[in-house]
């Protein structure tokens, strides 16, 4: 692939890690952000210490505070911003673009209130004449490992296979490998909903439960993620792949996961407001829990784990009471679509 100009919208941990992957592949990387001090740090010190204290970035990676300058002559634009601000930022990008580009995103969540997936938001806010079909970049990946070039395998999903292949080639190298998929709904819902289960898995750890309980919540969590995804039109096989069970494992078992850490703190009895303040980063699983719970109610999809976590976070339900309620649900067969 010839050298590409890629604008990375969002200088967070994952945006920074993906910028390094693209730079390693010989592409011109322009990171855009709205915090002047952070932009100056990336350009002058070649660091982003808020997220990576000991990492020095290649000096060829440039950061911009001016959005039009970051987007100038870009071949592709990668959104890596929190779900709750995606629509606002997409509007800004649409206004600043003056030519057609490939549009990708690597965020995981459902928009509050609308319950929309991120690709849908981008389709609504960026005119078709300015973009390709949206490509979702998702899968089992910790920024802390990707930034040190640890082996990582993820998925590039798009309605248009050729566009997905473009992104596959754009990112893939000796330590970072992408597989293509055309099931955008499946890949996006898997990436968003696994954050809920990760909060629950962390809570079990914080309460002192062992591996049996953690395996239970991951596998039964995958079942209800699949139920909702299929209701929305996803291919159930997607959930057995990298963006499904792969991402659920990596997020639901690791201290690198901010969702797992948030759940762990909840399990230890900490208050949610204190957890969010101490984390200093967006915990997507918190807002996604509400969106998924409301969506499940609307579509009549059985999601007992999501419902339990919703009650704990938004209705001040005692965690142990929520667990007791799940464990005393009506007996089911494992392979029933409606079973726990």
From Swiss-Prot:
Alphabetical GO biological process terms: carbohydrate metabolic process; glycerol-3-phosphate biosynthetic process; glycerol-3-phosphate catabolic process; glycerophospholipid metabolic process; phospholipid biosynthetic process
Main location: cytoplasm
UniProt keyword annotations, A-Z: Cytoplasm, Lipid biosynthesis, Lipid metabolism, NAD, NADP, Nucleotide-binding, Oxidoreductase, Phospholipid biosynthesis, Phospholipid metabolism
Pathway(s) of this molecule: Membrane lipid metabolism; glycerophospholipid metabolism
Cellular localization per UniProt: Cytoplasm
EC number: 1.1.1.94
Keyword Nucleotide-binding belongs to the record: yes
Keyword Zinc: no
Its job: Catalyzes the reduction of the glycolytic intermediate dihydroxyacetone phosphate (DHAP) to sn-glycerol 3-phosphate (G3P), the key precursor for phospholipid synthesis.
Name used for this protein in its record: Glycerol-3-phosphate dehydrogenase [NAD(P)+]
Organism of derivation: Streptococcus sanguinis (strain SK36)
């Amino acid at each position: 692939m010839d050298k590409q100009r890629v604008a990375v919208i969002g200088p967070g941990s994952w945006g920074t890690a993906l910028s390094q992957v693209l730079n390693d592949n010989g592409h011109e990387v322009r990171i855009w952000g709205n915090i002047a001090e952070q932009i100056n740090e990336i350009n002058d010190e070649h660091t982003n210490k808020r997220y990576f204290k000991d990492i020095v970035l290649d000096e060829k990676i440039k950061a911009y505070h001016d959005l039009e300058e970051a987007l100038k002559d870009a071949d592709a634009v990668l959104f890596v911003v929190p779900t709750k601000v995606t629509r606002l930022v997409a509007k800004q990008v649409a206004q600043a673009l003056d030519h057609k580009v490939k549009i990708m995103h690597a965020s995981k969540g459902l928009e509050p209130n609308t319950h929309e997936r991120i690709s849908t938001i981008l389709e609504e806010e960026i005119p078709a004449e300015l973009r390709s079909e949206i490509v979702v970049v998702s899968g089992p990946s910790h920024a802390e490992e990707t930034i040190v070039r640890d082996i990582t395998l993820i998925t590039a999903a798009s309605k248009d296979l050729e566009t997905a292949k473009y992104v596959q080639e754009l990112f893939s190298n000796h330590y970072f490998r992408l597989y293509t998929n055309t099931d955008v709904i499946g890949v996006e819902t898997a990436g968003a909903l696994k954050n809920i289960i990760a909060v629950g898995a962390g809570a079990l750890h914080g309460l002192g439960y062992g591996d049996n309980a953690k395996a239970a919540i991951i596998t039964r969590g995958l079942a209800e993620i699949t139920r909702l995804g299929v209701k929305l039109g996803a291919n159930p096989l997607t959930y057995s792949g990298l963006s499904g069970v792969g991402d659920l494992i990596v997020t639901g078992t690791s201290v690198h996961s901010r969702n797992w850490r948030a759940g762990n703190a909840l399990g230890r009895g900490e208050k949610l407001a204190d957890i969010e303040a101490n984390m200093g980063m967006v915990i997507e699983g918190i807002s996604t829990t509400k969106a998924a719970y409301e969506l499940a109610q609307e579509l009549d999809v059985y999601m007992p784990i999501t419902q339990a976590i919703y009650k704990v976070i938004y209705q001040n339900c005692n965690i142990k009471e929520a667990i007791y309620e799940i464990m005393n649900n009506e007996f089911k067969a494992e392979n029933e679509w409606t079973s726990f």
